[in-house]
Amino acid sequence: MSATTTAARPGTAGAGAFTSIGRLDALDWALPLVPRDRRGAARAVLAFRAEVQAVADGAAPRPEKRGRLAAWRLELDALEAGLPATPVTIALQQPLHRHRLPRTELENLVLAADMDAGGVMVAPPQCDLRLYTRRSGGALIILLAAVLGDTSHAAGCFGLALGEAMRLTTLLRDLGPAARAGRLCLPRESLAEAGIVAASTAEVLDHPALDAACAPVAATASERFADARLMLPEVALPARPFLRAVLEAHEDLLETLHARGRGAAVQPPPSPGRVALAARVLRHRFRGAA
């Protein structure tokens, strides 16, 4: 089977599979803040992220998942050569050149999905968690900043800060569903410091010290949000409304998770409030890039 054939059917999450990105989230709600002539490119980036993550979240055997993700990396080669073979890479063809999307960041999205598919994200070492959030969150924000016209070093640094904070927050949000699917994003160092020794990911959810294990992750997310806020004025003006809205929405989510405490892991993950997100989009539209 050719690489492009495999990539053309990357696999989707099965009926019982865990997926954290299929639902409407703050990134989708903030899309109206992307200029109309760039919105299709932003949607193409988000669609690519969803396609590769669907492979990792699907019910296929691990070797098959990793084979499909390897095929997606080959499909990126085809995209660069001007020969995309899948709907999502065809949609990326014009944005790749028009907005100078960094190929390495598209590949980072695939590598993050491969970490999920390969079983790395089960109580990973802190260094692996940091790498994962850089590849999944950092890459995504850097790509979206490029779509919005900023490929500068400052935008890259901002993207790394916001991407890490955003991804740590959504990992905490999805802790319950992920654990029930056999994943656990909490770093082993935090689990050890909290005194959690469990035979399964599901047992971690019931442990009375769960809040203590989550606290360092939440603290890092909060610190990186603060870093991103400090860096935002260095980002190009047209990119700021969208990126500011994404930052604020995820900061709000982190506060909600903190208020819910241990219950956040056993209750359904909170979704962004539609009214609040819509109000934020309107506010940033009128506020502009200031």
Residue spans for each PLM region:
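Catalytic cores of Mg2+-dependent Asp-rich isoprenoid enzymes
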Residues: 1-166, 172, 176-290
